[in-house]
Amino acid sequence: MSTAIAQQKIRIRLKAFDRRMLDLSCDKIIETADNTAATAIGPIPLPTKRKIYCVLRSPHVDKDSREHFETRTHRRIIDIYSPSAKTIDALMKLDLPSGVDIEVKL
């Protein structure tokens, strides 16, 4: 246990409403990590969150007539092991779509 060296890890969490845009962003991150000799694990899909909104169709009385809308939040995790300074610089300069929320933990 004492001989094990603590490996440095970067965990990247991605969230988006559009699944295709999320997958393209994951591919860009993994490609960047592979180009800088870091080991990328993922993308690991997490459960999709569904938020349902119930709205009355009529502006006046008809409470029986309702309409349902939903938003789906797709999530992924990517782990990057043994990153170098070059890897971190490349990830900082990476241009990703604005519809993807990125959270990075070291």
Swiss-Prot record:
Molecular function terms, GO-annotated: structural constituent of ribosome; tRNA binding
Keywords of this entry: Ribonucleoprotein, Ribosomal protein
Gene Ontology cellular component annotations, sorted alphabetically: ribonucleoprotein complex; ribosome
Keyword Ribonucleoprotein: yes
Pfam families, sorted: Ribosomal_S10
Entry's Gene Ontology BP terms: translation
Highest taxon in the source lineage: Bacteria
HAMAP family: Ribosomal_uS10 (MF_00508)
Family as reported in the entry's similarity comment: Belongs to the universal ribosomal protein uS10 family.
Complex and partners: Part of the 30S ribosomal subunit.
Described purpose of this protein according to its UniProt entry: Involved in the binding of tRNA to the ribosomes.
Name of the molecule in the record: Small ribosomal subunit protein uS10
Origin species: Synechococcus sp. (strain CC9311)
